[in-house]
Amino acid sequence: MVSVSEIRKAQRAEGPATILAIGTANPANCVEQSTYPDFYFRITNSEHKTELKQKFQRMCDKSMINRRYMYLTEEILKENPSVCEYMAPSLDARQDMVVVEVPRLGKEAAVKAIKEWGQPKSKITHLIFCTTSGVDMPGADYQLTKLLGLRPYVKRYMMYQQGCFAGGTVLRLAKDLAENNKGARVLVVCSEVTAVTFRGPSDTHLDSLVGQALFGDGAAALIVGSDPLPEIENPIFEMVWTAQTIAPDSEGAIDGHLREAGLTFHLLKDVPAIVSKNIDKALVEAFQPLGISDYNSIFWIAHPGGPAILDQVEQKLALKPEKMKATREVLSEYGNMSSACVLFILDEMRRKSIQNGLKTTGEGLEWGVLFGFGPGLTIETVVLHSVAI
């Protein structure tokens, strides 16, 4: 008779969960940040609000964003005028867009990840799909399974409306799945489309304008598994440790509410201060067991909620400017893509590390950290181990 402990041992992988491939995708429509205020106030019939437009221009100028990609084109917005008003009932119109576009964009990223992985898609055992928009049944996980032609018995996990910290959440979940299911290969997809949050400006709700200045659309996909097959699978990063915590005294710092007018976001001004105040504790918990206390000796992937968060984290920890280079590059070229952002940064870092002839996928360094920040205020922490190039 086989014991339960023997069964459990046989079910578990031997090595750590490893990122084996990364793919990214964006809508074709690219908007330049410098001219976006003109477009935004024109398409929302708000050009008479000259002072508000000047404020929005300053927000865009300070955002450290050069361009973003958006599903919403001028043509689509003209066909859906309710989406352009500040709080007009428009959820049906938004839903009709995102329930199609979220899985479609996710498929585009997933196809790239599967191609890089080099294994047949029939070997995918689990699917994690994450999006802030488009709640529907059956969900985007089901739609993606159909779009990709995955096996009907792939084990699916659907995460809706988690927000900007969820890039860390999907990695934490993928790690647990890969390490506790021998031979598992987990397809992770984060697909974010701002059609659910776009709306016209309001003089009385400047926090809504902040979101209009920062958010962009994008999807990222990973293949995660333990015990990579030699000569077949190519490890990129190993995931060593994960944690999630709610920052103390942070209730109401970041909220999102689904209304007839779409998804509304509410931000407090002290979000950067809350993040920087709590990041040291998260780092100590993560790196003390490794004997690491010099945070300039590790590579950094932080959700770029906005330049103020990155600035305050750098200042609090006395980080060298180059530590956030990959993070700032993604913010600059894509804006804040919510959960997908940190996965884009993983891709950016490994690509630049290879291009620059460095020794590891983590900018030549051995250890690194990935942070997700979002509603709650929730902080996700992932300790990464780079791979030799």
Swiss-Prot record:
Matching InterPro entries: Chalcone/stilbene_synt_C, Chalcone/stilbene_synt_N, Chalcone/stilbene_synthase_AS, Polyketide_synthase_type-III, Thiolase-like
UniProt keyword Ribonucleoprotein, yes or no: no
Superkingdom of origin organism: Eukaryota
Keywords in alphabetical order: Acyltransferase, Flavonoid biosynthesis, Transferase
Gene Ontology BP terms: flavonoid biosynthetic process; polyketide biosynthetic process
Catalytic site: 164
Catalytic activity: (E)-4-coumaroyl-CoA + 3 malonyl-CoA + 3 H(+) = 2',4,4',6'-tetrahydroxychalcone + 3 CO2 + 4 CoA
Pfam family, one: Chal_sti_synt_N
Protein name as it appears in the record: Chalcone synthase 3
Species in which this protein is naturally found: Pisum sativum (Garden pea)
